[in-house]
Every structure is written in structure tokens, then in C-alpha cells.
């Protein structure tokens, strides 16, 4: 008689940690969680701390916290002072020298929030990759989430890296984001940039596709239950379709003359449109970071000043951008002490 004895497989520390991280629990951790959870916790904690207690008086000449009387719309974690350049503003660095109060005053919370926020978003993307691999599905959710990551990184990190300092990045707040949008329009003519146009088409197109798709599915649900609505009739494990693709195809064929006949192509298109919009707008922001002026009237104004033969049309768009610059240059960058003589300020139709 032969007795087979199983050899003990030596399990190292990595295997033990891997088992613990991937254990079935209410909130999955995984290897991606080692990046996601600490970074997200620190980024959100820094944002709540900054909007509650920390002033922007020393960086922007503004009150920006609840403690100073701001509300949810006006509170923000403001970007560092222009004089800080592109320093990462470590608490132990030469600027703050370990002084937490000074670190908050010079804008250290902004770099802390931005960097931990970026790594938190990357961790969330990796989390979707990891769980997709474990449950055996495709990783298109993670690929789609690359769009928001591209926008965050390009706007909050790449754009200010191309400018003079972190000062020109958007601060983390509602009104602060709108200020940044005005800045992009006035100094870069952002709305006339084709990459912005593609981004708008992608986001609004994605919203339209989402609304059409949701309404069409609701319209073509099979009546397979006795309840007042069809929600209770659905079971997650049913083998039958929940709605009629054939009916939906006939409906839109009658309306548009063409319709999606393939669910895979339909849903890929719903993925492709908004994600492509996010990526193209991110590419446009990188162009602004490098001060590419192909769609910026400032370059035409400079050329017109140098070349008497060069003509530009003075449009409402030019008037808008000049007005934004005249207002924001002094208000937004008080440390520069800009003074504009009245004769150079735009005067609308009184020209």
C-alpha cells in the first residue's frame, strides 16, 4: 500500500499579506487599498481642515475659511503664494522649517491635498483594475476612470508646472474653481480652443447618450411582474433579458432612420464619447500650461502692436477677455501691484 503525504508548501510573508488584503470583507482592501485609503483620507482631511480653519491672507490676500466667515461656496484650500514657486512645501522643508502654523500660512495644505488627491484617484483606478481581475471581468471601468484622473492631473498639477508657480493652479473650493475658469478664459481664450470644444462635446454628448439610453431601456422593459412597477420583477440572476433590444432598435430606426443594433457597440460608444472628451480637454490644458497661443487673441494683440500691416477684428470676445484681464490681474495677483491707466481699459461700445 502506498501512502501519499502532501508536502507543506512554504508560504512567505508576501503570501500572508496577499491573503489578508484580498480577504472577503464588507469593504475590500486589496493592494490598491494601500495607496487609495491613506491618500484619500489625508487629502479629504487636509481639505476639511483647510476650509474650516486656515486663512489665505498670506497667499492671496483673502479670507477662505469657515472660521473667517466664509460659506461652502467661498471657503477653499488656496494655492501657495507665488513666491513659493514649484516647491513641494514639505512641512520639514526650508520654507516651513517644521512650523505647522507657518506651513499652513504659506499654502502647504494645497500641495498636500493636491498630491495626496492625485495618488488617491490613481489608487481608485487601480482598485477597479484589481477587483475586475479578481472577479474575472474586463477592466473598462478603470480605463474609463482614466479620464477624470487625466483632467485632475492636467489642471491641478501640469498647468501650474507650466506657469510661474503653484499659485496659478485652482484652489480647492467652489468659487475658487469658477475663478480659475474665468482666468483660463481671460488669459488663454479657453472657450475658443478646439480641445475645449471637443471636451464639451464629449461631456454633453455623454450626458445625452446616458439620458437616451436610460429612457429607452425603461420604455422597452418586459412586463414580467404583477407589481405596480417592474423593479421587483427583476432578479439579478435571471437568464432572460430585462428589456427588448429589438423593440428599441425599431423605435430609433423610425425616429432617426438609423439605430444601434448591437449592444456591445452601443455601450462602447457610451464609454468612448465622454472619456474621449475628458482626454481631449486634458490635452488642451497641457497646451495652456505651455502657453500655446494659437487660439489666444493676446498673441494677435502683441503682433498687431509690432506690425502695422497686421489687422484684427475687435470682437465681443476680445472685449470680454480684456475686461477679465483688467479686473483679474489686479484682484487676483495683488502682490504684483499692477496699475492700469484708464485709457487702456476696455470701454465696451463707447470705443
Curated annotation (Swiss-Prot):
Gene name of the record: psbD
UniProt source species: Galdieria sulphuraria (Red alga)
Residues annotated to bind a plastoquinone: 213, 260
Main function: Photosystem II (PSII) is a light-driven water:plastoquinone oxidoreductase that uses light energy to abstract electrons from H(2)O, generating O(2) and a proton gradient subsequently used for ATP formation. It consists of a core antenna complex that captures photons, and an electron transfer chain that converts photonic excitation into a charge separation. The D1/D2 (PsbA/PsbD) reaction center heterodimer binds P680, the primary electron donor of PSII as well as several subsequent electron acceptors. D2 is needed for assembly of a stable PSII complex.
Cofactor note: The D1/D2 heterodimer binds P680, chlorophylls that are the primary electron donor of PSII, and subsequent electron acceptors. It shares a non-heme iron and each subunit binds pheophytin, quinone, additional chlorophylls, carotenoids and lipids. There is also a Cl(-1) ion associated with D1 and D2, which is required for oxygen evolution. The PSII complex binds additional chlorophylls, carotenoids and specific lipids.
Gene3D superfamilies cross-referenced by the UniProt entry: Photosystem II protein D1-like (1.20.85.10)
Name of the featured protein: Photosystem II D2 protein
Enzyme Commission number(s): 1.10.3.9
Top EC class, one word: oxidoreductase
